[in-house]
């Protein structure tokens, strides 16, 4: 489902001349998830120009000339940068590969590259694989006749695998089909065996995974073709063999050597020679989804003998697990759905994910299919407007199906918007076109029965994750041989080669389509006229497991698509059947229940339900389905997710809070799309901006939406401007804006200007952001404005200079509305006093901000002058006893009504307690004190208890979590509990007071019969209450951050 299109991966060449770039751009070291470069070593080599790489290889040959198995220029002349890295790691194990690389760059006068090489080796040296001084440099010694056989084998491989795709199978037998390669897959080819971090080891097993039809088999055949041309890792001198799993999994037992001999008839001696050097074997295994037997995962059942005749499942499992031929290199082509089956057998596999067509390749395919015509432009614009449909086109064969289906509609003169109201309807139009000529010989009743049987077969197999369908499956679905023959003729089903009674759906898309159709078919003559979806199966269809897409996601899309009334009408017309909306009513009952029981987890992307609702496209249905959505967490990474999110958010009537993570660089997409439509605005970029505006409009139209959190996000100027405009809209009722780990460029005039443009905004949080001077000046300006109604400002872990913090503190004075300021994990050092001087503040938190005992005197002085402060937290600063003494001395002389003081984790000891108890007895306003995580120990707590006995001490809440005291002080504490009439909450958790201490305190506690609302926390007993579970007063809530729970 995902269709993220990252920027081009084109290498940036460098030169060794004086004009060489001053640095290697950081992005050139990164790789997209699932790329063969991910976690690769020496990635900087891909930035080497062609001329420089050729020079590097010439110098490398000189280094290799002393080996027992020298490399020739013919073997490296066409080698890619990744193959050169592979050769380096292979011939120079451990750090020697980096030393040789650095030396060669030094000879080439590439000083900057030498620095980069040294930086990498220093980073990975601790985890690097130890040097093997006995590197095996052996090869198979072949006689002339044997070399000739290998040459003939390579010739046969080139003939067999060119063209790369098979024109005799679906959809190659369709006249308008044409093949277009996926450029990124071509780039992946030479990188498949790139050595990986952290050990710098060359992968011996590579699992190439991807969606059905994405191009795994084509890539495998491309590897074989390039190997036969000596263009794929030529320095390895491999013998490569491609096996479909059905070749291995025969009904009769066979040995692996016999499998090889089938490729080389009459070459038994040659096979034995090759098998004696298994490190020179390259084995490609494909077709796991068509296996009709189960893989074996019990090691004791496997075999290491390649001469032994074995059942197919044992032979295949022995190869996958490296029990047999552990030195051989394996390339495995596998679907996502087969990964869990194979994963337990594989040892240290390197995972490569094939992404399919990117946006540019999809556009190119449409343009090549339709030509550069007005009709082609209309179809392309229509497809790009439907982002779900366009994202499905990343699979090449699906892209062709969509083009073919839309072309049929254009040829009939149909309006695409009306005839194809959603993505599902495009597939309805195409797939139904396979039926008429072959179905017309059936009576209507037979046609209905055969269609039901096909749908039943598809549904059962989808629920059971079954791709190969046997005789029993056909019988269960009541699909007779006549129907099977008909569907084989339509290319909807395909018989597995060598398996007389086993079939697969020709395309998984067909299987998903007919499985969903099963639940909308109507049978008026029956008592129950439709097949009911169970509660569990509905949950499976709309689930988003761990943030990824379920293998049932397309089936779920098709189901909801069929339930769109216009699409349902197209189904009835195209398939000559009736449609039931019975499951539509059930969906409306089940969806709210699922959301209540299992709400989406943070970071899980866009919920699968949102895609399904976008596909049904019916206002009333969508609004009712989203009735219980009060908070939505979305991770948006592509244009499809923007469009779908906008559609659904606008229909969440009771939405209160939105959390957005925007991981797509909108500006890159804008430029990329525009470059494909020179002279005009690209449909995708135009649509993307429109959909983003649509999403932002939710803040202006939903008067219940009060909270927006932006996390890990980057927004280009046009998109940030659109968001800010929506937040400034007069109808926007947003009260809280939280910016966490966003790009610093987002703190610009547009977004900060929202503080004066929105009169409802009361809370602003900026967290984990580099705050630049320009942003602070803007913030200071709006904070001084009388139109700024902000009441609470939270700045956490913000990278800024001391001057910036000083300027901010000085500029807060002019804001009469700001009552709460939370500063956490910021390097304030000597700037803390500026914030205590802000006259209008009632609540101030300066936590973990590098305050020290040296700053406490100025802090205490400012505290004395404050008139409004009720809550102060200086938690997680190393104030020590000497610094805290200034705070204690200030408490009796305060002009402000301070009620809560938090000195949690401030490096205090029992030495500060004498000053503390004096202050507590003299200050009449302080009600709550948090001293947790300080080393008060028994002596300090005993002194504190003496103060609490004093009737002048009005403290109601005392928190002493993890203060390192024991049962020794419990007698004094019990005595205090008997006499103190004010204390309502006492936290003693994480202290080793033992059973004796607990019993002593419980006795004192239970003796206070008149005290009905005392709560205290002690070790082992989470909470003990006397008659009432009433929590401590809400005014004094909180642990380390006494202000974190404040609502605007």
From Swiss-Prot:
Ranges of Low complexity composition bias in the record: 11-23
Extent of the LRR repeats: 815-838, 839-861, 866-890, 923-950, 980-1007
PROSITE patterns: DAPIN, NACHT
Subcellular location(s) per record: Cytoplasm
Keyword Magnesium carried by entry: no
Region (Disordered): 1-23, 1029-1048
Binding positions for ATP per the UniProt entry: 210-217
Disulphide-bridged cysteine pairs: none
Keyword Cell membrane: no
Annotated phenotype, changing residue 1045 to L: In a colorectal cancer sample; somatic mutation
GO MF term list: ATP binding
Keywords in alphabetical order: ATP-binding, Cytoplasm, Leucine-rich repeat, Nucleotide-binding, Repeat
Domain (NACHT): residue spans on this chain: 204-527
Any Gene Ontology biological process: regulation of inflammatory response
Pyrin domain mapped to chain residues: 33-131
Predominant localisation class: cytoplasm
Entry's Gene Ontology cellular component terms: cytoplasm
Pfam families: LRR_6, NACHT, NLRC4_HD2, NOD2_WH, PYRIN
Summary of the function given for this chain in its UniProt record: Involved in inflammation.
Family in the record: Belongs to the NLRP family.
Name by which UniProt lists this protein: NACHT, LRR and PYD domains-containing protein 8
Species the sequence originates in: Homo sapiens (Human)
Gene: NLRP8
């Amino acid at each position: 489902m995902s269709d993220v299109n990252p920027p081009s991966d084109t290498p940036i060449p460098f030169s060794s001349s004086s004009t060489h770039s001053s640095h290697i751009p950081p992005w050139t070291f990164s790789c997209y998830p699932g790329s063969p470069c991910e976690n690769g070593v020496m990635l900087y080599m891909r930035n080497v120009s062609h001329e420089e790489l050729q020079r590097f290889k010439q110098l490398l040959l000189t280094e290799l000339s002393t080996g027992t198995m020298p490399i020739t220029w013919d073997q490296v002349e066409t080698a890619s940068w990744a193959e050169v890295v592979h050769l380096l790691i292979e011939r120079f194990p451990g750090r020697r590969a980096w030393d040789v690389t650095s030396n060669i760059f030094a000879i080439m006068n590439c000083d900057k590259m030498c620095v980069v090489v040294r930086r990498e080796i220093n980073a990975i040296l601790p985890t690097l694989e130890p040097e093997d001084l006995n590197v095996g440099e052996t090869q198979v010694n072949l006689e002339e006749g044997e070399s000739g056989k290998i040459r003939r084998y390579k010739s046969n491989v080139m003939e067999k695998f060119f063209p790369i795709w098979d024109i005799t199978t679906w959809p190659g037998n369709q006249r308008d089909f044409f093949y277009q390669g996926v450029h990124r897959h071509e780039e992946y080819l030479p990188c498949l065996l790139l050595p990986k971090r952290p050990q710098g080891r060359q992968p011996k097993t590579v699992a190439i995974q991807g969606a059905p039809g994405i191009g795994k088999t084509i890539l495998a055949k491309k590897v074989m073709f390039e190997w036969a041309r000596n263009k794929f890792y030529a320095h390895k001198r491999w013998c490569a063999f491609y096996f479909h799993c059905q070749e291995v999994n025969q009904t009769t037992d066979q040995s692996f050597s016999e499998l090889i001999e089938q490729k080389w008839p009459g070459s038994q001696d040659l096979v034995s020679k090759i098998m004696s050097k298994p490190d020179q074997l390259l084995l490609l295994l494909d077709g796991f989804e068509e296996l009709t037997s189960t893989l074996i995962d019990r090691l004791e059942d496997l075999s290491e003998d390649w001469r032994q005749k074995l059942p197919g499942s044992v032979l295949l499992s022995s190869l996958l697990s490296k029990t047999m031929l552990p030195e051989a290199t394996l390339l495995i082509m596998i679907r996502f759905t087969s990964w869990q089956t194979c994963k337990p057998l594989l040892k240290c596999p390197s995972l490569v994910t094939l992404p399919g067509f990117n946006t540019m390749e999809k556009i190119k395919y449409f343009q090549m299919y339709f030509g550069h015509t007005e009709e082609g432009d209309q179809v392309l614009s229509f497809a790009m407007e439907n982002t779900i449909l366009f994202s499905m086109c990343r699979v090449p064969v699906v892209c062709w199906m969509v083009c073919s289906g839309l072309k049929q509609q254009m040829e009939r003169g149909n309006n695409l918007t009306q005839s194809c109201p959603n993505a599902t309807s495009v597939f309805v139009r195409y797939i139904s076109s396979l039926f008429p000529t072959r179905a017309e010989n059936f009576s209507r009743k037979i046609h209905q029965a055969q269609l039901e049987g096909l749908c039943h077969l598809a549904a059962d197999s989808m629920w059971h994750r079954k791709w190969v369908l046997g005789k029993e499956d056909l019988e269960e679905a009541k699909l007779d041989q006549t129907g099977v023959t008909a569907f084989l003729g339509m290319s909807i089903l395909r018989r597995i080669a060598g398996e007389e009674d086993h079939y697969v759906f020709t395309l998984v898309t067909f299987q998903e389509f007919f499985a969903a159709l099963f639940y909308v078919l109507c049978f008026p003559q029956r008592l129950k006229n439709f097949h009911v979806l169970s509660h569990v199966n509905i949950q499976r269809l709309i689930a988003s497991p761990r943030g990824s897409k379920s293998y049932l996601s397309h089936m779920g899309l098709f189901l909801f698509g069929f339930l769109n009334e216009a699409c349902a009408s197209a189904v009835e017309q195209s398939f000559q059947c009736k449609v039931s909306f019975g499951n539509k009513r059930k969906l409306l009952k089940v969806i709210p229940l699922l959301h209540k029981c299992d709400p989406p987890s943070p970071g899980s992307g866009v919920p699968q339900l949102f895609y399904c609702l976008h596909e049904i496209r019916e206002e009333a249905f969508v609004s009712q389905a989203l009735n219980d959505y009060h908070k939505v967490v979305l991770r948006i990474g592509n244009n499809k997710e923007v469009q779908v999110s906008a559609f659904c958010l606008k229909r969440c009537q009771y939405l209160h809070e939105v959390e957005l993570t925007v991981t797509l660089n909108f500006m890159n997409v804008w430029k990329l799309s525009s470059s494909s439509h020179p002279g005009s605005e690209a449909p995708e970029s135009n649509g993307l901006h429109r959909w983003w505006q649509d999403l932002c409009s939710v803040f202006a139209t939903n008067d219940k939406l009060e909270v927006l959190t932006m996390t890990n996000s980057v927004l280009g100027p046009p998109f940030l401007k659109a968001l800010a405009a929506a937040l400034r809209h007069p109808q926007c009722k947003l009260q809280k804006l939280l910016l966490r780990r966003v790009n610093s460029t987002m703190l610009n005039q547009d977004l900060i200007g929202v503080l004066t443009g929105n009169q409802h905004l009361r809370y602003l949080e900026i967290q984990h952001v580099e705050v630049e001077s320009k942003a602070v000046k803007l913030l200071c300006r709006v904070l001084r404005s009388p139109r700024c109604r902000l009441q609470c400002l939270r700045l956490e872990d913000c990278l800024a200079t001391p001057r910036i913090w000083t300027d901010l503190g000085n500029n807060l004075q002019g804001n009469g509305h700001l009552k709460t300021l939370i500063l956490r994990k910021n390097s304030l050092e000597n700037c803390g006093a500026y914030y205590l001087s802000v006259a209008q503040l009632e609540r101030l938190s300066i936590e973990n901000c590098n305050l020290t005992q040296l700053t406490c005197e100025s802090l205490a002085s400012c505290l004395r002058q404050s008139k409004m402060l009720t809550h102060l937290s200086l938690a997680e600063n190393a104030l020590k006893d000497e610094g805290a003494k200034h705070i204690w001395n200030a408490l009796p002389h305060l002009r402000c009504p301070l009620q809560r003081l938090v000195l949690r984790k401030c490096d205090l000891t029992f030495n500060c307690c004498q000053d503390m108890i004096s202050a507590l007895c003299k200050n009449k306003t302080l009600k709550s004190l948090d001293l947790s995580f300080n080393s008060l120990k028994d002596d300090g707590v005993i002194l504190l208890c003496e103060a609490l006995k004093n009737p002048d001490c009005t403290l109601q809440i005392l928190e002493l979590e993890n203060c390192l005291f024991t049962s020794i002080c419990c007698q004094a504490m019990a005595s205090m509990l008997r006499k103190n009439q004010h204390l309502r909450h006492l936290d003693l958790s994480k202290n080793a007071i033992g059973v004796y201490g607990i019993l002593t305190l419980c006795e004192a506690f239970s003796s206070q019969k008149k005290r009905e609302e005392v709560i205290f926390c002690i070790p082992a007993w989470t909470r003990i209450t006397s008659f009432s579970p009433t929590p401590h007063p809400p005014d004094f809530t909180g642990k380390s951050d006494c202000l974190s729970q404040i609502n605007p």
